[in-house]
Amino acid sequence: MARDKVRVKKKASKNIAAGVAHVNSSFNNTKILISDVQGNAISWSSAGTMGFKGSRKSTPYAAQMAAEDAGRKAQEHGVKTLEVEVQGPGSGRESALRALAAAGFNITSIRDVTPMAHNGCRPPKRRRV
């Protein structure tokens, strides 16, 4: 039995002028979420969704590609200005930020919202390579 083709509706354009870019850069991956000022998601992307697998997800180039993809989707909804919130210790922080700036967004502020433990949980042991 043949399956019926499912029609996927394209999301309606929201026309939002300002947004917040949340760049979450871990040691293994980089995720970019662009939301409106209230925090409702407009677009998102990650190094994994861009087709990178394994250790290639943690590269600055993968973060740049993910930021360009999320930025392109956000521009379809009319986003022009961004506040950037960077979180995490990963290598994709700066390259994702540069990619958003190169995509034509007017970046108004950059905040580092990495949570810092006040002597909380014990960190993972040091790697011996």
Swiss-Prot record:
Keyword tags: Ribonucleoprotein, Ribosomal protein, RNA-binding, rRNA-binding
Q: Which GO terms describe its molecular function?
A: rRNA binding; structural constituent of ribosome
Q: Which SUPFAM superfamilies match?
A: Translational machinery components
Q: Name one GO biological process term.
A: translation
Record InterPro entries: Ribosomal_uS11, Ribosomal_uS11_bac-type, Ribosomal_uS11_CS, Ribosomal_uS11_sf
Q: Record's Gene Ontology CC terms? A: ribonucleoprotein complex; ribosome
Keyword Ribonucleoprotein present in the record's keywords: the answer is yes
Any matching Pfam family: Ribosomal_S11
Superkingdom, according to UniProt?
Bacteria
Q: Give the function comment from the record.
A: Located on the platform of the 30S subunit, it bridges several disparate RNA helices of the 16S rRNA. Forms part of the Shine-Dalgarno cleft in the 70S ribosome.
| UniProt family annotation | Belongs to the universal ribosomal protein uS11 family.
Q: How is the quaternary structure described?
A: Part of the 30S ribosomal subunit. Interacts with proteins S7 and S18. Binds to IF-3.
**Listed name of the protein:** Small ribosomal subunit protein uS11
Species of origin:
Roseobacter denitrificans (strain ATCC 33942 / OCh 114)
